[in-house]
């Protein structure tokens, strides 16, 4: 399963079938230590992000007499120091713009909620991905640690004016235009998959915003090791977002039937 990153300087890229991995496929790891985040319900320390890549992975293990034992790492924060500040909003408006005919379009980012698999399949069709069984798509979404989406919501300007006055806001159309998801062990590591943006909305920086918001949400949950896979032509795109190829000589590897 490959990624389709979209940025203002990149065109649509099409991934090969999910069961094929070309030789120009790269593993990237998030390593930008200055990436801005808002702290969530726990106080995060920068030591974990400054550690070598494998140090945080090995932090919960210790070797003793040729055996590996699981040990409990020290708590990163005392109970009395815990913050109650909430995590990033589950849903917020990323872009709002006025269109012709008195319409207003909002691009809404969400790090939660459900996705209609038929909408996702339609989005995959638009970017040229091969179709995958709907049952497997639903299972992939269900088993993901986090699913981030971009929706376009179209409404009339009169609806916006009435909502400001306290009346109910009537949404005329809501369309899935972007998605990215992450799998995780819920403690140390996360991998980002399936980054895609509707071709009609490419070239506007929405893919960059989608990845940045997803990374922030993962960091807020104290997930420090974030990786993804990218085709060679979009490695620079992810490196500009703080990802690093082959940190400390570590390479991602794949197994697939001959």
UniProtKB/Swiss-Prot annotation:
Catalytic activity, as annotated: 5-methoxytryptamine + acetyl-CoA = melatonin + CoA + H(+); L-lysyl-[histone] + acetyl-CoA = N(6)-acetyl-L-lysyl-[histone] + CoA + H(+); L-lysyl-[protein] + acetyl-CoA = N(6)-acetyl-L-lysyl-[protein] + CoA + H(+); serotonin + acetyl-CoA = N-acetylserotonin + CoA + H(+)
Gene Ontology molecular function terms on file: aralkylamine N-acetyltransferase activity; histone acetyltransferase activity; L-lysine N-acetyltransferase activity, acting on acetyl phosphate as donor; N-acetyltransferase activity; protein N-terminal-methionine acetyltransferase activity; protein N-terminal-serine acetyltransferase activity; protein-N-terminal-alanine acetyltransferase activity
Active site annotation, chain numbering: 238 (proton donor)
Loss of function: phenotype: Dwarf plants, reduced starch accumulation, lower Lhcb1, Lhcb4, and RBCL protein levels (but normal corresponding transcripts expression), and delayed flowering, particularly in low fluence light conditions. Suppressed expression of caseinolytic protease (Clp) and chloroplast heat shock proteins (CpHSPs), essential components of the chloroplast protein quality control (CPQC). Increased oil and anthocyanin content in mature seeds, but less mucilage accumulation in the seed coat. Lower anthocyanin levels in cold-exposed seedlings.
Subcellular location: Plastid, Chloroplast
Induction notes from the record: Expressed following a circadian rhythm with the highest level 4 hours into the light and the lowest level at the end of the night. Induced by osmotic stress (e.g. PEG), especially in the presence of hydrogen sulfide H(2)S. Accumulates in response to high light (HL).
Chain intervals for the UniProt region annotation (Interaction with begomoviruses NSP protein): 107-194
Binding annotation for acetyl-CoA: 195-197, 203-208, 231-233, 238
Annotated phenotype, changing residue 194 to G: Complete loss of interaction with CaLCuV NSP protein
Keywords, ordered alphabetically: Acyltransferase, Chloroplast, Host-virus interaction, Melatonin biosynthesis, Plastid, Stress response, Transferase, Transit peptide
Primary localization class, coarse: plastid
Known regulation of activity: Inhibited by the viral nuclear shuttle protein (NSP) that binds to the region required for oligomerization.
Single biological process term from Gene Ontology: melatonin biosynthetic process
Enzymatic class: transferase
Disulfide linkage: none
EC number: 2.3.1.255, 2.3.1.48, 2.3.1.87
Pfam families per record: Acetyltransf_1 (PF00583)
Domain N-acetyltransferase positions: 107-258
InterPro entries hit by this protein: Acyl_CoA_acyltransferase (IPR016181), GNAT_dom (IPR000182), NSI-like (IPR045039)
Temperature dependence comment: Optimum temperature is 45 degrees Celsius.
Family: Belongs to the acetyltransferase family. GNAT subfamily.
Function: Protein acetyltransferase with dual specificity triggering both N-alpha-acetylation (NTA), with a preference for alanine, serine, threonine, methionine and to a lower extent valine as substrates (can also use glycine and leucine), and epsilon-lysine acetylation (KA) of several plastid proteins. Triggers lysine acetylation in KEA1 and KEA2. Acetylates in vitro histones H2A and H3. Does not act as a transcriptional activator but required for the dynamic reorganization of thylakoid protein complexes and grana during photosynthetic state transitions. (Microbial infection) Required for begomovirus infection and systemic spread. In case of begomoviruses infection, acetylates the capsid protein (CP), but not the nuclear shuttle protein (NSP). Stimulates melatonin-triggered defense responses to the necrotrophic Botrytis cinerea.
Note in the entry: Lacks the bromodomain involved in binding of other acetyltransferases to histones.
Protein name per Swiss-Prot or TrEMBL: GCN5-related N-acetyltransferase 2, chloroplastic
């Amino acid at each position: 399963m490959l990624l389709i990153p979209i940025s203002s300087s990149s065109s649509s890229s099409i991934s090969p079938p999910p069961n094929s991995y070309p030789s120009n496929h790269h593993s990237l790891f998030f390593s930008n230590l200055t990436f801005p985040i808002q702290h969530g319900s726990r106080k995060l320390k920068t030591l974990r992000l400054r550690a070598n890549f494998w140090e945080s992975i090995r932090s919960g293990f210790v070797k003793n007499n040729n055996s590996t034992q699981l040990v409990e790492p020290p708590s990163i924060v005392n109970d009395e120091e815990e913050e109650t500040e909430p995590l990033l909003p589950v849903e917020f408006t990323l872009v709002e713009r006025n269109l012709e005919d008195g319409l207003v379009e909002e691009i809404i980012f969400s790090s939660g909620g459900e996705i209609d698999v038929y909408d996702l399949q339609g989005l995959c069709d638009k970017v040229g991905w091969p179709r995958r069984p709907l049952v497997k798509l639903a299972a992939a979404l269900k088993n993901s640690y986090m699913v981030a989406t971009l929706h376009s919501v179209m409404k009339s300007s009169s609806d916006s004016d009435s909502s400001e006055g306290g009346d109910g806001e009537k949404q005329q159309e809501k369309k899935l235009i972007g998605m990215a998801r992450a799998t995780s062990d819920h403690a140390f590591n996360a991998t980002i998959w399936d980054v895609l943006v509707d071709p009609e909305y490419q070239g506007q920086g929405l893919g960059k915003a989608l990845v940045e918001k997803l990374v922030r949400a993962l960091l807020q949950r104290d997930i420090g090791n974030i990786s993804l896979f990218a085709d060679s032509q979009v490695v620079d795109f992810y490196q500009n977002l703080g990802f690093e190829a082959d940190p400390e000589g570590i390479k991602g590897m794949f197994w697939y039937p001959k």
